[in-house]
């Protein structure tokens, strides 16, 4: 065979004959402390039970080893990590753009969308854009942001409220209230 590679599996824990310590601190199947024993004795005990000797903490002095079924241990570990991933909620920031002259109908539609975003558990970013002469009437922009804030007071908390205009826009960030 030409140019073949030998792929060595790297396990997170050393098992059975891979353990290099002379003496180990041994724990039983149920987690009960057996004590500090010779590696040969520990391997013998694990073979008698038909299980594996797994090095749990290699940096300890002496290394901690446990008698267990290694395949079952890996399965349980992957299962618990999958469960943790399921429980994590990714929070997205949804953006809605307003203008100082946004009419009532458009305002209600945008407010409905904001309510939907917040109920889904996402943060909402309200961007208020100014064009041309609207820059002279920044008070109207602040009034629009205050109106949005007051309309959503039961659903959201204000994470960031602009103190002044940034460029040609003002940005307010809302986070959903915890239930």
Curated annotation (Swiss-Prot):
PROSITE patterns: IF3 (PS00938). It holds the Pfam family IF3_C. GO terms for cellular component: cytosol; membrane. Its main location: cytoplasm. InterPro entries: T_IF-3_C_sf (IPR036788), T_IF-3_N_sf (IPR036787), Translation_initiation_fac3_CS (IPR019813), Translation_initiation_fac_3 (IPR001288), Translation_initiation_fac_3_C (IPR019815), Translation_initiation_fac_3_N (IPR019814). It is found in: Cytoplasm. One of its GO terms (molecular function) is translation initiation factor activity. HAMAP family: IF_3. IF-3 binds to the 30S ribosomal subunit and shifts the equilibrium between 70S ribosomes and their 50S and 30S subunits in favor of the free subunits, thus enhancing the availability of 30S subunits on which protein synthesis initiation begins. NCBIfam families: infC (TIGR00168). Monomer. Belongs to the IF-3 family. This is Translation initiation factor IF-3. It comes from Buchnera aphidicola subsp. Acyrthosiphon pisum (strain APS) (Acyrthosiphon pisum symbiotic bacterium). The gene is infC.
């Amino acid at each position: 065979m030409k140019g073949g590679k030998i792929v060595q599996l790297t396990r997170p824990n050393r098992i059975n004959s891979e353990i290099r310590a002379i003496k180990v601190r041994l724990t039983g199947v149920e987690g009960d402390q057996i004590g500090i024993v010779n590696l040969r004795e520990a391997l013998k005990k694990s073979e008698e039970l038909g299980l594996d000797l797994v090095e749990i903490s290699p940096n300890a002095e002496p290394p901690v080893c446990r008698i267990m079924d290694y395949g079952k241990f890996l399965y349980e570990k992957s299962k618990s990590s999958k469960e943790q991933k399921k429980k994590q909620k990714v929070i997205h920031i949804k953006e809605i753009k307003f203008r100082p002259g946004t009419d009532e109908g458009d305002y209600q539609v945008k407010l409905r969308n904001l309510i939907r975003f917040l109920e889904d558990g996402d943060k909402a970013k309200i961007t208020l854009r100014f064009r041309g002469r609207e820059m002279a009437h920044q008070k109207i922009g602040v009034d629009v942001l205050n109106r949005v804030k007051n309309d959503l007071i039961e659903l959201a908390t204000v994470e960031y409220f602009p103190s002044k205009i940034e460029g040609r826009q003002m940005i307010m960030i809302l986070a959903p209230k915890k239930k």
